[in-house]
Amino acid sequence: MVNLSGQSIFPKGLSILVPIAVAGMALMSIVGMQLYAPSGLKGSGMNSNPTEKISATAAQQAQQQETARLKLLKLLPALGYNNLLADWTFLSFLQYFGDDPAREKTNYELLDDYFEVIVTHDPRWVEMYNFLSTSVSFYQARPDLTVQLIERGLQSLSPAKNSKAWLVWRTKGIDELLLLGDSQASAKSHEMAAQWAEHTPDQDFSPRLREFAETLKQNPDHLLIRIQTWLMVYSTTQDKLVRKRAIQELLELGVKIKTQDNGELTFIIPPETSKKQNKKK
């Protein structure tokens, strides 16, 4: 039998504080977990039924409550639940993002706040960065914030930690090229994507990424590259807003668009586009 009557290691009078401290930490953990949960602490104030109409006043109040909750989430310690808290914050983001009636009243100004919390607690979650780009760059119209958050996340990423990490550099490079108009930054990002793709199951992408980067460095205003990249954006998403933006940009770049009998779109790149680019080489 173990003897539990040994002398306490705490000075007399302080030992009583130990269970209080433990209880305090437990309480903080519970409160923190409730705050991170999709419903928040006594609910986040978001519309629980996104199909219902909501008044402008109610939408603003819900937005203010969610703003306050997200500020707390940025300050509270994770207490070892980083991945779980990032997951719950992502679920809250989905609820906020999908609440169309409320977003019509308040717009999407909290999107970067959700992803700041997520990137802080789980920066190695590679798949999350696509949602970051689509939502913050297109819906919130802040690709600059997308790039800033991606740069923070990349500090914790490497191909050794996740073989798909090169995709994050690729996402950054696309936003820099198409939405920020920074061809040189995009070229650097694609060079890094190529470097990180080496010695991974996706190593076949590395030469193409390097070629893409080299083309941008030699011709920052390469029209065909922009057209092909917008076509890639259109074909890899089902999001209506992103597709609408891609179509708009392609039309401005001179691409002809025809609607087939089945409703699918056909994109026709003017022959002179390729000829012009070949002359510049």
Pin down the residues of each PLM region.
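Solenoid-repeat scaffolds in large eukaryotic assemblies
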Residues: 111, 146, 185-187, 226, ...
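Terminal, low-structured helical/coil segments at or just beyond the last alpha-helical repeat
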Residues: 209-281
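Short coil/turn connectors between adjacent alpha-helices in alpha-solenoid helical repeat scaffolds
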Residues: 99-107, 137-145, 178-186
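Amphipathic alpha-helices of TPR/Sel1-like and other helical repeat/solenoid scaffolds
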Residues: 69-78, 96, 104-122, 145-158
